[in-house]
Amino acid sequence: MQVRIFVAVALSSALLAACGGSSNSSRAVPVNPATNNNGSPATGVITARFDPTNGVLPFPTNLLLSGTRDLTLNIPVVDPNNFGDPKVALNALDGFSTVSPMTTSFSVAPKVSTLIAGQTVRVFEVTLTGTGGGVTGIVRELQATADFVVAPTSSDSSGRTLAIVPTKPLKQLTSYMVVLTSGITDAAGNDVTPDQTYFLTKRTTALCVGGVSQEPLLPNATACALEPLRQLTGSQEAAAGAAGIAKDKIVVSWVATTQAITPVLQALQNRTAQSAPPATVIAPTGLTLGSLGVGLPPVADIYIGSLEVPYYLGVPTQANPTAALTGFWRAAPGAYVPPFAGALDPTSTFVTFANPFPVVTTAQKVPMVLTIPNASSGRTKPAAGWPIVIYQHGITRDRSDAFAIATTMAAQGYAVVAIDIPLHGITNPANPLFVGNTPLAGLGVRERTFNMDLVNNSTGAAGPDGIIDTSGNAFINLSSLLTSRDNIRQAETDLSTLTRAIPTMRYSGPADFDGSRIGFV
C-alpha cells in the first residue's frame, strides 16, 4: 500500500538527481563502472522504492505515527471527520494489523528467486525508544515459513510489489523491523539499490547541526528535515548490523508496531466482573422443543427472557434512523489510564490501549431464549443448578438457532441460553418468538435489529420496502469500518455480560443455574 505522507522531506527532483553518488566524492574524479555483488558489471538499475515526499513508502510503517498526540496513527487525510474514508478509520487505531501482509515496492520487478525469507528479506521483533522511535535492540528474528513467507503481490500485475505475509498472527503492541538486502536482483542479475531518500538517510554522520546542513548539496531546511529520518534509519541499520547484516548491503529498512488486540476487551471484562450482575427477566412460553414442528423431541422447555447490556454503539432514532450504521465506540475525552493520564491529547475520544473504556450510549434490553431439560429428558436439576451452555449463532442467523443443539444438551443435563449479536434477531413478525409477539415488548425489550427497514430485501437497493431488513444485513459495514469492528467488539462484551448474569438468573428457584459450569458453543 502506498500512503501519501508528509514527513518534511521536501526534496526536489533536480536535487536528488544530483545526489547519485557519495556526497564526499569529488565530482571531477572518474569512478569505476558500477558492479554487482558477484563482480559482474551492472547493466540496469533496480531500486527499493522509498520516497516519502511522493507517498511511496513500505506499508505499514511507523512513519505514519509521526506527530501522533494520542498514540493512534496519523495519516494525512482531507477530512479527519469522514470516517467512511478508510484512511480516516485507520487513524483511530493504535497500531497496525497483526495478520495483514506488509508490502514494499521496487522500481522494476525483482527476480522472484532472489526474494528469500530469512536471507534477502529479514524480519525482527525489536524494542524502540518510544512510540514511533528508534530501534534500541532486537528481541528475536522471525523465521522463514514458521513466522512469515514472501512473494510478489497478486494485486500488482507488474510484479514490482513484494508482500511479507505472516503465517501466524504477530504479537500485539509489538514492533517489527524489516530489512531488505542487495541480494535481491532484477531479472538481469542487477543488485537492488537504495532509493535516493533512503540513500541519504544511510549517512552515518548528521545531515544537520544547529540548523546548518552538513551536506553540500542539501539546503539547510532539507537537511534538517531529513535528520530525524536519518536517525531512525541509523538505529535500524545498527540493530541489523548486530544481527550480522552489513550496512552497505541494506537497501531499505522500516519498522511497524502492531495494534492492541485484547486490552480494551479485557478492561471491559474486568469492569463487568467487578460490577453487580446485570438485570434479567425469564418467562415460560409453554412450549417445548417438540412444539417447534421440526421433528425435535420434547425434552426441553422453551423460555424467553431479556438481558440488560451496556451498549456502546449508535441506536436508530426518528431523527437519525441510520445511527446504527455509522456509530462506533468512543471513549470519554482524554480519559487515559496510567501511565498515560495527563501526557496525551486531552480531547481524543478514540478507544485505544491507553484510553480503553468506551462511553455507554444506552442500556439495551436484549432478548434471550433458553431451553431447560424437562422430565422427558430423564434429567433432574442438580442442587447447584443446571450447568448451562451459551450458544452463539453465526452472522445473518439469530438466537433461535440454539434449538438445534438443545436436544443434545438436554440429554446431557445442560440448559442452553442464547442472545443475538448486534443488528441480528428474529425479523419475521409472524414468528411467535418475535419480541413484538411476547410480553417482553411491554418491558422495553427490542429485537437487536431495531426492526430497521433501510434496504429492499429483494434487490439489496437502498431504501425501505416495508419489510424489516434481514438479520445481520448491516453487521458487516464496509462504508464504516470502525462500526464493523465495534459490532464485533459489542458482541464479545455482551457475552461477558451474559456470563456475569447467569449465576443470578432465575426461572423457578434460588439456584437455577450453576455459575461454575458455563460452556460455550
Where are these regions (language model features)?
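Bacterial N-terminal signal peptides that target proteins for export
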Residues: 1-7
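Conserved helix-loop functional segments at active or binding sites
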Residues: 373-377, 397, 501-509
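Alpha/beta-hydrolase fold nucleophile elbow
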Residues: 511-521
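C-terminal motif of bacterial Sec signal peptides marking the signal peptidase cleavage site
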Residues: 15-18
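Structural recognition of the beta-strand scaffold that forms the well-ordered cores
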Residues: 102-105, 255, 388-391, 415-419, ...
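Short beta-strand-to-loop junctions in surface cap/lid or active-site-entrance loops
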Residues: 367-384
